[in-house]
Amino acid sequence: MSFTSLPLTEINHKLPARNIIESQWITLQLTLFAQEQQAKRVSHAIVSSAYRKAEKIIRDAYRYQREQKVEQQQELACLRKNTLEKMEVEWLEQHVKHLQDDENQFRSLVDHAAHHIKNSIEQVLLAWFDQQSVDSVMCHRLARQATAMAEEGALYLRIHPEKEALMRETFGKRFTLIIEPGFSPDQAELSSTRYAVEFSLSRHFNALLKWLRNGEDKRGSDEY
């Protein structure tokens, strides 16, 4: 086989400070790279689907807005004509009130559409989150963080008891494991003598949902 046709995989992690690179390290990096590529493809497909659904909802809302605007313009023209012909103040007030009711209804429909878009995005995010492998995501983040902290010396990993076997199988003696029964299964803390990094997939995801919902609440309190 010609060496010019061999497939190449670029590993972005820092190489170990050793003359000989162990095959286990290369295998781990290739596995993490494949998992990262698969996760990117899945998340890209989910986000693209969410964008398409959101764009359709927005187009429908804009179309309804245009139709309502045309109807309101037609009603307003009729109102002006009848006002000039009949000069009936009472009828004019009633018709104006009707237009105001239509405007309030339209405003309500737009608010409902915006709320529906938010809910759709939230449902897509929840579906994406449910499809994620907590173990693979945690191992990937730990490996990446360990590479960044490679110069820190001894590294200590605090984890939930359920993850002890997984971490020993994945990282061997790379970390000093400390079992924390109070941690959630998706929570971990990697530390050295100088600093520590803690992460929790569910906590970060819930923070994203909170930001999404708070953004909707703030817009709902603004004047239209």
From Swiss-Prot:
Coiled coil: none annotated. GO terms for cellular component: cytoplasm; host cell cytoplasm; host cell membrane. It is found in: Cytoplasm. One of its GO terms (biological process) is protein secretion by the type III secretion system. Belongs to the SctL stator family. Component of the type III secretion system (T3SS), also called injectisome, which is used to inject bacterial effector proteins into eukaryotic host cells. Acts as a regulator of the SsaN/SctN2 ATPase activity. NCBIfam families: HrpE_YscL_not, PRK15354.1. This is SPI-2 type 3 secretion system stator protein. It comes from Salmonella typhimurium (strain LT2 / SGSC1412 / ATCC 700720). The gene is sctL2.
